[in-house]
Amino acid sequence: MLLIGVAGTELTAQERDWLQHDAVAGVVLFKRNFASRQQVTDLSAAIRAAAPRPQLICVDQEGGRVQRFREGYSDLPPLQDIGALYATDPQQALALAERHAWLMASEVRASGLDLSFAPVVDLGRGNRAIGNRAFSEDPQVVAAFTAAYVRGMHSVGMAATLKHFPGHGTVLEDTHVDTAIDPRALDELRAQDLVPFQAGIAAGADAVMMAHVIYPQIAPEPAGYSPRWIQDILRGELGFRGVVFSDDIGMAASHSAGGVPARVHAHLDAGCDVVLVCHPELVDEALHAVQGRSLNTAALLGLIGRGALGWDGLLADARHGDTQTRLLETLGRTV
């Protein structure tokens, strides 16, 4: 299955045709798709109306610098700001993370989307792409926050996606623009980077997004192209039974597999359930690539959002304003 990107704030005729394709599981929205709260709500409805089957509509609404929808939405702080509170008051910090998750997820669901790809459970160890998106450099601290964040998302009826497996935080390179190689052995990764993923799986996380990082001591290809990582370690060793997403095949580090068809097939052959094709100019080629493949069409049904309030109901809910106030009082910033 594919999650695709669309070009603008309204669907084009070509994009409506794409949504008819059996392999299209849904759409990932970005800043380019956002003009206002009402517009993105209308776009979500248009996507569903254009497709003959349920569509999974997604966004990256983590907070901090990775927040695609801003005007009309809470200005969510980065996870690192919450993580910094853990040293002085762990219980308050974890409660705040759960509230952050509730606020983020409730606003995304009120806009007609199903999920935000969250939480980031990479360790905060200097990676250019991760930075303050991570809670902490300490695996046990990140593990505790991961469980809290999953609970907060689930309380709104949003599925939780752990990313980026098996851990993107220790390499320096940004896989959007560079190849990234992590030379560590599997035992070290088990003791460090895998710890938050184990906690998230135990907390009932619904999906995992793979990293485009290469771990040559474990497998020669990026993790998202690796049956060793997906089938043997994630599913076999860690017991994960949910949905496995690739990261975007438009990222530079994904090009090692070859052209667009080769990238799509490499992800699916390795065990990914869903391949992200976020750049609209790659969608036609990706759709041609999956013709004739057996696709796991049932995998995504459990990720469809449940129980949205709608914006009127959400703004009338005392928890919305109270959560904004708690974040403001605790972190000293307007949300």
Swiss-Prot record:
Gene name per UniProt: nagZ
Disulfide bonds: none
EC number in record: 3.2.1.52
GO cellular component: cytoplasm
Protein name (Swiss-Prot/TrEMBL): Beta-hexosaminidase
Active site (UniProt): H176, D247
Pathways per UniProt: Cell wall biogenesis; peptidoglycan recycling
Annotated substrate binding sites: D60, R68, R133, K163, H164
Family: Belongs to the glycosyl hydrolase 3 family. NagZ subfamily.
Site positions per UniProt: Important for catalytic activity: D174
Cytoplasm found in the keyword field: yes
Organism of origin: Stenotrophomonas maltophilia (strain K279a)
Molecular function terms, GO-annotated: beta-N-acetylhexosaminidase activity
Pfam families in UniProt: Glyco_hydro_3 (PF00933)
PANTHER family given in the database record: BETA-HEXOSAMINIDASE, BETA-HEXOSAMINIDASE-RELATED
Entry keyword annotation includes Repeat: no
Keywords of the record: Cell cycle, Cell division, Cell shape, Cell wall biogenesis/degradation, Cytoplasm, Glycosidase, Hydrolase, Peptidoglycan synthesis
Stated role: Plays a role in peptidoglycan recycling by cleaving the terminal beta-1,4-linked N-acetylglucosamine (GlcNAc) from peptide-linked peptidoglycan fragments, giving rise to free GlcNAc, anhydro-N-acetylmuramic acid and anhydro-N-acetylmuramic acid-linked peptides.
Record's catalysed reaction(s): Hydrolysis of terminal non-reducing N-acetyl-D-hexosamine residues in N-acetyl-beta-D-hexosaminides
Compartments in which it is found: Cytoplasm
Database matches in Gene3D superfamilies: Glycoside hydrolase, family 3, N-terminal domain
